C-alpha cells in the first residue's frame, strides 16, 4: 500500500536528466517537417465534422468498411458481443464472415445507450465503484484508434488496424422511442401500399449512424492465458521462444507508452504458426492448410512463427497517473518474460524513435491530439494532460532501455509527467519540463 511521497520534483528541459527534451519555438510550428502537421492545424482551426462518410487513407481498410456497409444493407447485421462492459459488435461481410469489431461511442460504459444492464446498475447505484477516475469518460473509441496510431508509428505491428468510422445497423442499441417511431412509419406505409399500390405517407429516415472504433478482426489467434499455460506444459523451441519474447516486448512498449489500465492476460492474443518444413508440403496444401492452428504447440518443429495481437485498448491514455484507489497494474509484469531485459533488437528498433523529441512531439503527440480533437467534447487542456503522461512514459521507457532494464523493472519506475509550458524569459517559446508524480493509489496490487 502506497502513500503520498511529497512535493513535485521539477527540472528544466535543458538539465542532464532530460537530454532529449528540447525547446519548441511555437506549438503550431514543427521542429521538423511532418506531413500530418498541416492537417492537424486545420482540424483544430475549423473543427469540421469528419464523419459524413467513411474515408480513410488506407484503400484496403476502406474496402473492408464498404464490405461491412454492404452486408448491413443486405441484412447481415452486426452481432453484439456478450462479454465486456460496453456495447461492442462483431461486424460481418455478406458471406457471414467476421471482419471487424465495432465499438460505438454512445454505448461505452458511461454512455447513454450502454446495453449492459449490469453496468447500468453499477453506474447508477454504485457510482463510487464504477469507472476509472484517471480516464476521460466516453473516449474509449478514441483510445482504440490512438493505440493503432502508436503501433503504426513505432512499427510494432501488433495492434489490428483501427480507425474511427460511422456505421448504422438495427442491431445497435437505439432509444425505444426512435425504434418505435421508425417501426410505426414502416407499418403505416405497408398498410397504405396494400390499398393504394405505390403510395406512401411517410418518407422513411434511416436510424442515425453511430461513430465508434472499427478494429479489423484477426483469425487463428488464442488467448494469451491459454497459450502461456500450453508453453508451461510443453516448452517452445528456442527459436520460437525468442520470437515470443520479442513480440512480448513490443506489447510492453505499446502498453507502457499509452498507459493501458486494462491489460490482463485475456485481452491480448497469440498466434502460433508451424510453417511447412519443405516446399513439397507447401505445394500440396492450400494456404490455410499449410499453417497449423494456433491451439497446438509443436515443440519438435523449429520452423515456426509467433505473433501477438494487442486488442481491447479502449482504457488507455489517462490524463493523470492512477492516484486514488487502484493502480491498474500491467498483468504481464507477473510473467517470467517480464524479468528478461529488453533485447538489443527491440532497443535498436524503438530507441531511435523515442529518443528523438521531435518525433515524439510531431509524429506521436500531434497525431494523437489531432485524433482526440475530433470528439465533440474535445478539451485541449485535458488532452495536453494526457500527452504529458504519455511523454513521461516515453521518457521512462527510453531511460530503462538505455540502462538495460527489464519490463518488470520498468513498471516499478516512478511515474513521470513531461509538460509543455511557455517560457516567458524566452519570448514565449515552448519548453518541456519534467516532474515526478507525487500521488499514488491506495492499493498498488490491483
Each language-model region and where it sits:
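C-terminal catalytic region of ATP-dependent kinase domains
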Residues: 3-20, 24-27, 31, 39-44, ...
Amino acid at each position: 500500500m502506497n502513500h503520498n511521497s511529497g512535493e513535485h520534483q521539477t527540472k528544466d528541459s535543458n538539465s542532464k536528466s532530460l537530454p532529449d527534451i528540447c525547446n519548441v519555438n511555437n506549438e503550431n510550428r514543427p521542429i521538423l517537417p511532418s506531413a500530418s502537421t498541416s492537417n492537424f492545424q486545420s482540424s483544430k482551426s475549423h473543427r469540421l465534422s469528419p464523419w459524413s462518410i467513411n474515408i480513410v487513407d488506407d484503400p484496403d481498410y476502406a474496402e473492408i468498411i464498404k464490405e461491412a456497409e454492404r452486408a448491413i444493407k443486405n441484412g447481415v447485421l452486426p452481432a453484439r458481443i456478450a462479454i465486456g462492459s460496453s456495447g461492442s459488435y462483431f461486424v460481418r461481410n455478406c458471406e457471414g464472415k467476421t471482419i471487424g469489431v465495432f465499438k460505438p461511442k454512445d454505448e461505452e460504459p458511461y454512455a447513454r445507450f450502454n446495453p449492459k444492464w449490469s453496468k447500468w446498475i453499477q453506474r447508477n447505484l454504485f457510482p463510487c465503484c464504477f469507472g476509472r477516475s484517471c480516464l476521460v469518460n466516453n473516449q474509449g473509441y478514441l483510445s482504440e484508434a490512438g493505440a493503432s496510431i502508436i503501433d503504426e508509428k513505432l512499427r510494432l505491428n501488433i495492434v489490428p488496424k483501427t480507425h474511427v468510422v460511422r456505421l448504422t445497423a438495427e442491431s445497435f442499441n437505439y432509444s425505444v422511442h426512435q425504434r418505435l417511431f421508425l417501426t410505426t412509419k414502416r407499418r403505416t406505409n405497408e398498410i397504405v401500399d396494400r390499398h393504394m399500390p405505390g403510395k406512401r405517407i411517410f418518407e422513411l429516415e434511416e436510424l442515425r449512424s453511430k461513430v465508434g472504433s472499427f478494429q479489423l478482426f484477426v483469425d487463428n489467434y488464442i488467448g494469451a492465458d491459454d497459450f502461456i499455460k500450453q508453453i508451461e506444459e510443453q516448452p517452445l523451441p528456442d527459436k520460437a521462444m525468442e520470437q515470443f519474447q520479442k513480440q512480448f516486448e513490443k506489447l510492453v512498449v505499446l502498453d507502457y507508452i499509452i498507459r493501458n489500465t486494462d491489460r490482463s492476460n485475456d485481452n491480448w492474443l497469440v498466434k502460433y504458426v508451424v510453417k511447412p518444413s519443405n516446399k513439397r508440403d507447401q505445394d500440396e496444401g492450400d494456404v490455410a492448410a499449410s499453417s497449423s492452428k494456433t491451439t497446438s504447440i509443436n515443440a519438435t518443429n523449429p520452423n515456426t512463427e509467433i505473433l501477438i495481437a494487442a486488442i481491447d485498448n479502449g482504457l488507455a491514455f489517462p490524463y493523470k497517473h492512477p492516484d486514488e484507489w487502484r493502480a491498474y497494474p500491467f498483468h504481464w509484469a507477473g510473467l517470467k518474460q517480464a524479468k528478461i531485459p529488453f533485447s538489443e533488437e527491440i532497443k535498436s528498433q524503438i530507441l531511435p524513435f523515442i529518443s528523438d523529441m521531435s518525433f515524439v512531439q510531431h509524429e506521436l503527440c500531434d497525431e494523437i491530439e489531432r485524433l482526440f480533437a475530433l470528439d465533440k467534447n474535445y478539451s485541449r487542456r485535458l488532452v495536453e494532460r494526457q500527452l504529458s503522461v504519455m511523454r513521461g512514459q516515453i521518457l521512462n521507457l527510453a531511460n530503462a532501455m538505455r540502462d538495460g532494464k527489464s519490463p518488470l523493472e520498468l513498471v516499478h519506475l516512478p511515474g513521470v509527467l513531461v509538460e509543455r509550458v511557455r517560457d516567458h524569459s524566452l519570448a514565449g517559446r515552448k519548453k518541456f519540463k519534467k516532474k515526478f508524480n507525487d500521488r499514488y493509489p491506495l492499493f498498488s496490487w490491483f
